[in-house]
Amino acid sequence: MASISSSAIATVNRTTSTQASLAAPFTGLKSNVAFPVTKKANNDFSSLPSNGGRVQCMKVWPPIGLKKYETLSYLPPLSDEALSKEIDYLIRNKWIPCLEFELEHGFVYREHHHSPGYYDGRYWTMWKLPMFGCTDSAQVMKEVGECKKEYPNAFIRVIGFDNIRQVQCISFIVAKPPGVL
């Protein structure tokens, strides 16, 4: 067996005591004496926040007959000119336009499970490839027209994809099947 010299033990003891003094010991939480607590019973309800008495003007979205689909679905159907302006906004922000369509459901639905998953209506079929290099809303509107012609009973949406951040930045429905509000 090897024996350890007394100078080696002294060195170990010295470093141990030095290391122990580097960190201050935990002394517990500070007392609450420095923070006085004043409880005031506030039974005066006249000082509550108010919306200025405009409650009768605020309406919620009616759930019957007017399904909310995506970003601009609370608006009346947009004209081709208004859709072109939205697409121009998308292009100005350097997002890549992409068209998708859905033949059955134009909204998120859960058919096979109650928790969200891949097959719950979020992912639609892509129409052709994303329009990299697109500089004009007329190009996108032409593709929307072709998609409508090919699938007249489909929901069609335009997506703006940011290829730098790798995220979808905007999505809105541009066409719905006839008879769907």
Curated annotation (Swiss-Prot):
Compartments in which it is found: Plastid, Chloroplast
Annotated organelle transit peptide span: 1-56
GO terms under biological process: photorespiration; reductive pentose-phosphate cycle
CDD domains, sorted: RuBisCO_small (cd03527)
GO molecular function, one term: ribulose-bisphosphate carboxylase activity
Keyword set includes Mitochondrion: no
Highest taxon above the source species: Eukaryota
Entries under Gene3D superfamilies matching the protein: Ribulose bisphosphate carboxylase, small subunit (3.30.190.10)
Keyword vocabulary terms for this entry: Calvin cycle, Carbon dioxide fixation, Chloroplast, Photorespiration, Photosynthesis, Plastid, Transit peptide
Primary localisation category: plastid
Cellular component GO terms, alphabetical: chloroplast
Keyword Cytoplasm: no
Pfam families listed in its UniProt record: RbcS, RuBisCO_small
Assembly and interaction partners: Heterohexadecamer of 8 large and 8 small subunits.
Family: Belongs to the RuBisCO small chain family.
Function statement: RuBisCO catalyzes two reactions: the carboxylation of D-ribulose 1,5-bisphosphate, the primary event in carbon dioxide fixation, as well as the oxidative fragmentation of the pentose substrate. Both reactions occur simultaneously and in competition at the same active site. Although the small subunit is not catalytic it is essential for maximal activity.
Anything else known: The basic functional RuBisCO is composed of a large chain homodimer in a 'head-to-tail' conformation. In form I RuBisCO this homodimer is arranged in a barrel-like tetramer with the small subunits forming a tetrameric 'cap' on each end of the 'barrel'.
Name this polypeptide is given: Ribulose bisphosphate carboxylase small subunit, chloroplastic
Species annotation: Lactuca sativa
